[in-house]
Amino acid sequence: MTTDVQFSSQEIELFRVKEFLIANNPAKINNENKDAVLTQIEHDFRYLIQYIKDGLPNLNESTRLIFPDTFSICLLRSHQIIASKKIDSQEFLSAVKEQLLTEANANIIFEYVLDFWADGGAPLMNALRDLFSKLLNLLKITYPMSTLKDVLFNWMNEILEVPSTLRVQYYLIDALSSDFDLYYIIEKKPHFIDNSFSLMNSDLLANSVGKCIVSLLLNIYEKHFKKNESFVQEWIQLWKSCALKYIHDKQYTKSINLYIMIPLFKNMPNSAFTLFLECMSNKDPSLLLSLLKIGQELGIEEEPFCDNKYTTVDSVNKLIEQDEYKLQVFEILTFSTKKSKPIRPFVFKTIKQYLYVFFVDTELERRNYFCSSMKHFIFRTRDCAYSLARDARKLKKAEKFPDEQREKLAQVEEARAFLVWLCNFIKYNLAPGTLYQANVTSLKLMHILIKSGVDKSTPQKFLDNQNKREYPFSIPILQDVTFLRLLIDLLVSNYADVRELSKEMLFIMISADESRGLFLDTLDANALKWTATSLLSDYEKGDAGATVYEFIFTVMGSQRSFIDQTIDILAQMVQNLQNDSIGCAENSIGPHFAALSLILNKFNSEENHQDTSKIISKLINLVLKSWEATRNVVCHDSAHGILPEKYANCGVPDQVIISHAFRAIKEASYLLETILKKYPLTRDQLDSIGDLFIVQLSTIRHSGAFQAVLPGLKAFCIRCQLEFPAILEELLSKSVKSLKSKTQHITRRSGGLPFLVTTVLSAEVTKGRPLLQKTFENLLLVARLPIPPHQDEFDLPQVNAINCINAIFVEPKLSVHCTSFVSEALELALLNFDCDIWALRNCSIMLFTSLQNRIFGKVGRSVSAKLFFTKYSGLRQLLLNILNSSIAQYSGSERKSYQIESIFLVLNVLLRLRPTAGYTGLKEFNVSVYECLSNENWKIRDMASRVLHMLSENFEEEIRKLLDLASIAKQNQLHGHLLALQQLVPQYLSGTRDMELIQRILEKKRMLLLENKCFITKKAYLKLTCCILETCDIPDSILKDYISTLRNTFIAENNEYVVDGSKQLYLAQILDMLLKYEDSIYLDDICLLGLYSPFYEAQLSTLQYMNTNFHWETTRNSEFLEQLQLLLRVPDLLPMAKALVVKILSRKKNTLSLTTCTDLLKTNNSEDTKLAAVSSLSAKLSSQTFHQVWNLLQGFFADSCSKDFRLASLECLTAYPESCKNSRILLQLYNFLWDDDSEIREKASFYLNKNFIQTADWEYNRNTSVTALIFTKKFVDVFTSSEVVEELCLQLFQYLNEYDMFAAEESAKNCLFTIEKDNQFINELQKAMHILNMIKLTGRDISKCYKDQIHHLKSALLEHFNTEDFKDSPLGWCSNAEIFSRITLLKELIQHYSPSDYENFINVLTKHSVHPLIISYSQL
């Protein structure tokens, strides 16, 4: 590759034409230069037309784009000249009409657009679309429509013959839709609209198809029906059934609404929308809601839920209870095109009633969509309140309509009350122990409320400046101490986004003048700092500690001293690690670096300019010292262990030492990133940072650590690009030189060098990317260096260069700039396929894979062979040479495994190419592909069979050729041919019923099944015949003859047991076919043969069939029962088979005894077998066995049990007919509503809604939280006995007492990760409140033992307060979710069951500053 780009003569001429056309805008043409310019444009027009006529010679990647762009400009200039009033263009117009744009030439251009669109990428398609648009414009100004109509009509006919999966068809129809009546399309192609709708689930086609359908239908309404509204109904009938057919499918709904319904109804009379709604035969809620939303947005239906116009308020409530519809309902309920329009009271009421269903949503996309909708509603509420208050003031000032004034002010108060309620609701969902999704949603809504200006103390910079309006009231969010406590508590959340959102809210709070002083008086900075320090010393909580540190720094007055103290602590830690690398291996250096990084982001360097340089200097030195202290751990490279020998038996686990070291490097890199982005640095400091990155990327032995270094490296490169670009060139120069170094101990992917090269190159902003060009050339030079004899195979510079080239193509920021290098890189990869050195082959294969993904895209996609080999000239011969060479060498005496790799990779390329009509370049590969079909490697034969299928143009001819060559004397060849036939035959027979060929294949059964001794090729033949039977209807006589042969073969082979896996699979295949195609009267015999078979694969196939198809009504059930019970007792029966036996036996009443099930569960059986046993227990449930079965199942209800067992136990309960009458079972099903797994929650909810709550069938899938709430009321209506109250109390007090609130918290030693609860979904406090509410609703008192427990716990709590001289604070004792929920529950219990103690209890809580939300907590 040379630095001077070489252009072909065509490219040079196209560039000249393009530059000339751009330079000669008609506005610049005058009488003096007119003749010369117009003559030249005519000449260029002729040249461009002739270029198409000549077949576009020397077409390459560049020319493919330059040509249509140039021609578009030519057509545009021609149109501008003819349309110009300043130029006499009659002579030019005549030339265009008679010589340049004749009908024949217009057709040539059209054909060019049509041909090249199919295989073009997005840039080419855009260029061709522009070209066609300019062509149409020029034709319309050149010819009258009466003349042009025939040409366009012929084009339309040709367009309609284009495959429907190509976008060009839809674009061209859309482009022609304004020129004539397109109703004839429906007449000519009656299924066109239906076929078009069927493609609306394709992301690639939806936009183009949608525009086409809209243009077509609008054209028909305007030109065929003459915009006559009386024909709207008839117009709807043309497409209604097609729309309704697909719009119900979720894959289609969104795209049909977006690309068809909205633009269609937007351009039609409102009556069209109304009539479409009325003629809907199926009132599907989802469809109705989506259409009502469209009507709202278009201003056709403003408030569709009002006055029961389309549905009742009760139906709206039921719809919002279901996850499938809740977002649509909420959006319609809260949306208005007139934002200041008063909000109806039922809207506020419905939102209050059902807002919680959005806060428990586990789907991120739905939560984000809800937050967006809620934002619009909050701002609408603000605008509405503002408008109402303004109008009330005007009326008051005018002293008019006092009743209307009161009504408007009442509506303002209603809005204020709703927002106050919303703030309280948010508080409850920020409480310790609430779900992650509730936390995130609450924080986002809190942010929206603050941005909307609901608190007038909010600083201006935090308000939303779009459509600014002021509330006529203020809600003091920023001065609320409960919000302050909740937000500080969330700073230690395990979730980074929760910490960030909380931190953002706190920053707004302390920025407000009215709240800053209040909070500083409230907060105990020293206690917070102690907590933060404690968190920083804990590896798993280090990020939380760093976040708290940042918060303390933000509220502290003396920021410089705080930074100095933190630096001193960190410096001491680093020094200690250097002095005692074992004793201090667990020092929290990483978290302290993280804390400093966050602090520096908030540090005001401009106000502390003199101190900043000293701080930065200290920090850079600390980073360098930390690296020196940890490098012996992360750079250790030895076969004797992952750590240096001195760490052996040191008492600290290796993983802990490594994790602390890597984290120190990662957090130090983030600190450097902060410094590089924000603070001034000298050239020397930049050099030292750059040297550090080079050393780290060159010596670290762990790929994860490379990723840790990258943030800092990226910031470094961007900084250098702005200030010292020469540093980057030096870095690249050093990197390329280091490729050849033998002291690197490079890993097989070249360590951190590719990261270094790509990161530096990504920072380049110079036009043309000269640094990328130069680096790529240098890398290619290194990669192409000849390898001397006896070269070290593990330290090749060529390997490192190829890995760097691969990294460049993979890096998203660089890949777009590498198009011109693809051909050379592909050639480089291919040339090394058959290299002797594994490392070089391996890196070349990785490069090839990256390039293949770039060229072909997703797996399964293919490109035209002609286009591919035209685009990458020279590759066809290279691929052919490699394939032939590898086959020849592999067939010789010295066989090497890498030759198999070469064959496989070339075949993989061929598999992605599809034949092009008239192109013969693939035919030379056929001979080699046939040779590959005989290769001794199974994978090569398999790949070759699929390639042959892709290359074949005449399937019938290929099939007959393969059959003719089939012989059992050559088993590899036979196998390859059978695999190829498996690919070719089904596709051929799908288009024709060639019975002669089918009979010919089936007649080979004697040779291939009876005479053949190889079970692998026998099985391949069976699979081929199976494909035929699945594809075609075979005459009964032929089918019976073939199945009879299979039956006899199975009986004969099944009697002779040998240890042979291929025979096992072969017999299983025969058995599968017999069970599928054998006459039903023989099926019992076949199944029994399979069960008695000594081959486990045959047994397994039989059991799998019986599991789904066998019924115990058979007359031979005793034989089956005997054999299945016998199998159950076989000690070494396959676990999978044993599980199937249990499932089949469980379907026969009284076959599996309770004792047998118990034994299966208690003995050492597989999980599948135990699951089958659990599922079968439902049949054993009765009033007599309930306690025994219940005790067995209880072990599987727990959250600690696997999901499969919990699900099996749920299904066992729901299969029991009496479950909906048994209070204990119903309570367990209620518990399943809080399960960690959504499938279990939904199944429990479905059962309860259907069988216990007994709702309408379309309500069975309501939200599980709604079901839980409804259940609590329904349950106590049905069950009110003292036994039920006892069961509820048992659950409630078990939860209350299972956690010891007063025990000292223990931290796990050497713990690197937070130990999560088994159930991440349950809100334990909310569930406890549900149970307490059920107890209250029964109207029964609780027993004395439970009241004693309440008294005892209350006394213990008060004693703890007094003994410990207790005072709670943010991040304090009550911030623990377990403690918070239990004190809150205790408060509720005291209030209800010991009311005389309640006031004193609250006073004590208040005195000790207990979490304010505990005191104010009540059920919404």
Curated annotation (Swiss-Prot):
Which GO CC terms are listed, alphabetically? cytoplasm
Q: Where is the signal peptide?
A: none
- Is Cytoplasm set as a keyword in this record? yes
> One Pfam family for this entry, by name?
TPR_Trm732_C
* UniProt keywords, alphabetically: Cytoplasm, tRNA processing
Determine if Oxidoreductase is one of this entry's keywords.
no
Q: What is its main location?
A: cytoplasm
Q: What happens when the gene is disrupted?
A: Loss of methylation of the 2'-O-ribose of cytidine at position 32 of tRNA(Phe). Increases occurrence of 1-methylguanosine residue at position 37 tRNA anticodon loop of tRNA(Phe), indicative of a loss of wybutosine at this position. Simultaneous knockout of RTT10/TRM734 leads to activation of the general control amino acid (GAAC) response and severely decreases cell population growth.
Similarity field:
Belongs to the THADA family.
Q: What does this protein do?
A: Together with methyltransferase TRM7, methylates the 2'-O-ribose of nucleotides at position 32 of the anticodon loop of substrate tRNAs.
Entry-linked PANTHER family: DUF2428 DOMAIN-CONTAINING PROTEIN (PTHR14387:SF0), THADA/DEATH RECEPTOR INTERACTING PROTEIN (PTHR14387)
Q: What is this protein called?
A: tRNA (32-2'-O)-methyltransferase regulator TRM732
